């Protein structure tokens, strides 16, 4: 049964030795020493996984060859070429070093055929050209138990590391957005970034190896790389505007690079967090008959400052406010020279006044928003902004509505202004020619020319 299940994995491992190219997993090679055995992956250091002390390398199962722990693929290549043994699903082995050491000992106690499925290559060729390959996989109960025990051991190490971080009060970190320093527990800086910068990477109790996680994110920002789409930008301001406008101030849950920092990915052998969560939902979905196949997520819409009108793009919203309410936010921004933070204050100020049914032009309070809107349209008070000191206050840094999409689309980029508008703001200082004649008469050049 084991041989029939896995025969395809190595069936094309070697062809006739008449000079033809051999293949492993569909990849061809001419020289068996230079073959690529399987899709390669860069070495990873799973959080919390420790190696045996005094053993920085991993030995071959059969001989005395040793390879560094980080060069796992070279060892696999050596074993399949020199010893004709293939280990199935290596990526599901939680601790590769302990796994190899275990089987190295077992193969000295019993023949390899007691543990491995034997697959004969070129069975139709002459007997002297046939070769046997050995497949070690979890079909063997002993191998399955070993893999599960290694997984449990890694989970215990991860939970111990997590508990240590939860109890650690000597944490020191710097916010990657405002450079504020934090001392004490890791939860302080994580809660700060979630609360003050809307950057939520998860609950502190769900994260492990927090220092390494934060260093990984900080390195991306230092390289001017977006944390979500991982595009690189020319400067920090461009990156900041991109992450704010595109709402990319978050990490991509589909990026496997971050999986090792979440405890959920260590819970079950060979299962990602998505598969674990899907299993939890299946019990609920089994009792539901609703068809969600035609459900589509609608993009977040920006809401008008004065009425309930919503628009899918900010450009349409600007046109609506100008046509329906004679309020031109872009013109106000240009005339008053508002930067991003001042625009935020102004929008939050107007939102609060409209919410309180108060006209900010004449300070009259109305019974309903409809009455306020009628009054402001008739008196044209929508464009009658109060003095800057009225709305340019610290209290208006805080949004009136938590889901105000309009705030995410504001920009202080100079590219929003036309070339003419930019030139109008540049002062031109004329040259002082009042003393030009006297300067000419006293010049030393006159003496040289005489």
From Swiss-Prot:
PTM sites of type N-acetylalanine: 2
Cellular location(s): Nucleus
Gene3D superfamilies, per database record: Classic Zinc Finger (3.30.160.60)
Upregulation: Down-regulated by oxidative stress.
Keyword check for Nucleus: yes
GO CC annotation: nucleus
GO function term, MF aspect, one: RNA polymerase II cis-regulatory region sequence-specific DNA binding
SMART domains noted in UniProt: ZnF_C2H2
Family: Belongs to the ZNF277 family.
Record function comment: Probable transcription factor. Involved in modulation of cellular senescence; represses transcription of the tumor suppressor gene INK4A/ARF, perhaps acting via the Polycomb group (PcG) complex PRC1.
Protein name, as recorded: Zinc finger protein 277
Source organism of this protein record: Homo sapiens (Human)
């Amino acid at each position: 049964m084991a041989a029939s299940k896995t025969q395809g994995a190595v069936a094309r491992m070697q062809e006739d030795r008449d000079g033809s190219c051999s293949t492993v997993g569909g990849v061809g090679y001419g020289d068996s020493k230079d073959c690529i055995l399987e899709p390669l992956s860069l070495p990873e250091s799973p959080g919390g996984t420790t190696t045996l002390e005094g053993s920085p390398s991993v030995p071959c199962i059969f001989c005395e060859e040793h390879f560094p722990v980080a060069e796992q693929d070279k060892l696999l290549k050596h074993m399949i070429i020199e010893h004709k043994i293939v280990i199935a699903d290596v990526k599901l082995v939680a601790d590769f070093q302990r796994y190899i050491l275990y089987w190295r000992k077992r193969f000295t106690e019993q023949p390899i055929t007691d543990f491995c499925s034997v697959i004969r290559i070129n069975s139709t060729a002459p007997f002297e050209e046939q070769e046997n390959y050995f497949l070690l996989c979890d079909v063997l109960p002993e191998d399955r138990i070993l893999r599960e025990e290694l997984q449990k051991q890694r989970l215990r190490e991860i939970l111990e590391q997590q508990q240590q971080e939860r109890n650690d009060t000597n944490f020191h970190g710097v916010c990657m957005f405002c450079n504020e320093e934090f001392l004490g527990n890791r939860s302080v800086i994580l809660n700060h970034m979630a609360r003050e910068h809307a950057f939520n990477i998860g609950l502190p109790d769900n994260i492990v190896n927090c220092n390494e996680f934060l260093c990984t994110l900080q390195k991306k920002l230092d390289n001017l790389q977006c944390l979500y789409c991982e595009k690189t930008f020319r400067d920090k301001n461009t990156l900041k505007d991109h992450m704010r406008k595109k709402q990319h101030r978050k990490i991509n849950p589909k990026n496997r690079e971050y999986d090792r920092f979440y405890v959920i990915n260590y819970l079950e052998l060979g299962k990602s967090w998505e598969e674990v969560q899907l299993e939890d939902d299946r019990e609920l979905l089994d009792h539901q008959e609703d068809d969600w196949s035609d459900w589509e997520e609608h993009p977040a819409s920006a809401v008008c400052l004065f009425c309930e009108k919503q628009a899918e793009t900010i450009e349409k919203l600007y046109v609506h406010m100008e046509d329906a309410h004679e309020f031109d936010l872009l013109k106000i921004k240009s005339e008053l020279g508002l930067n991003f933070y001042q625009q935020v204050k102004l929008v939050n100020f107007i939102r609060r006044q409209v919410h309180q049914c108060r006209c900010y032009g004449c300070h009259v309070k109305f019974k309903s928003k409809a009455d306020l809107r009628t009054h402001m349209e008739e008196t044209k008070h929508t464009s009658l902004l109060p003095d800057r000191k009225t709305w340019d206050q610290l209290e208006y840094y805080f949004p009136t509505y938590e889901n105000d999409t309009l705030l995410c689309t504001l920009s202080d980029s100079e590219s929003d202004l036309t070339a003419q508008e930019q030139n109008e703001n540049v002062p031109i200082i004329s040259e002082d020619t009042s003393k030009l004649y006297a300067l000419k008469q006293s010049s030393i050049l006159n003496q040289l020319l005489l």
